[in-house]
Amino acid sequence: MRLLTRLLSVLCLLAAAVPAAFGHSAGEEMSSAAAAFLGSLKADQKAKATFGFDDAERTNWIFVPAARKGLPLKEMNPGQRHFAQAILSVALSGRGHMKAEQIMALEQLLLEIEQGSGPKRDAENYFVSIFGTPDAKGTWGFRWEGHHLSLNFTLVNGELVSSTPSFFASNPGKIKEGQPGLVGFELLRYEDDLGRQLAKSLTAEQRKQGFLSKDPYKDIVTGNKQKADGLIKHKGIAATALTTEQKQMLGKIIFEYVSRTRPDFAARELTAIDAVKDSLVFAWNGGLEVGEPHYYSIQGPTFLF
């Protein structure tokens, strides 16, 4: 996919600017931010926020309103929240961080829309957890999680090796009422439009493989399982069966998701994906028109969007 290669080049330029601007690697920046956060906490707060790296809690994740472990934002003072946000800001790209902030802000909007008729909404009910001891050369993890947002990062020997599971969702999907100036706002519109654009471009013959069902899945296929392998069983149309233009569309979708993370890490991830581009599979379920329920996925040998 030539476009994916070009987009990768852009990210490489951004990644090269990271050391120039900050002078530190992901491991150095994230561990420094995490250590500052932990240093700002009182003993009882730190007890809630920290776990051993091998603790089973590290692989526990959930994206619905539920009881969680970790230290919630509501139990932090403004300074501590600032330190917590600093970890997120060096783990994500600027755009990824903005999306995360907008997801949390939508919880307040839901509270106003539902007026207490649904689950309790709380824009401060997002939890920060540190697994292991943050160290520039160490092995540790970081999680930021709440309703519709689950961000998980793992560092091994000081290198950021994983940003999954990663979950960004939006409710309402599109703001249709209330809040002057916000009506029409759709947080994940670009991701949605890119997937629909590719699906609509498929020919009748291609749709025999690419369209799995007229009915979308009723919920997230992976749920909060620890491993996604085999859940969709690599069904769909192979990237090798796409036209050049369609491959470019596929590359744009992949770039949009991967570039939520910091540029240097995203560049490495895109390089790895480009190496297995002929093994990618795209699948669509549901309607093709805006507003119709739908679900799409992109799957490779070791990952699932």
Predicted regions: what they are:
Residues 8-20:
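Bacterial N-terminal signal peptides
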Residues 1-6:
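Positively charged n-region of N-terminal signal peptides that target proteins for export
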Residues 24-93, 97-305:
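A cross-kingdom marker for long, charged
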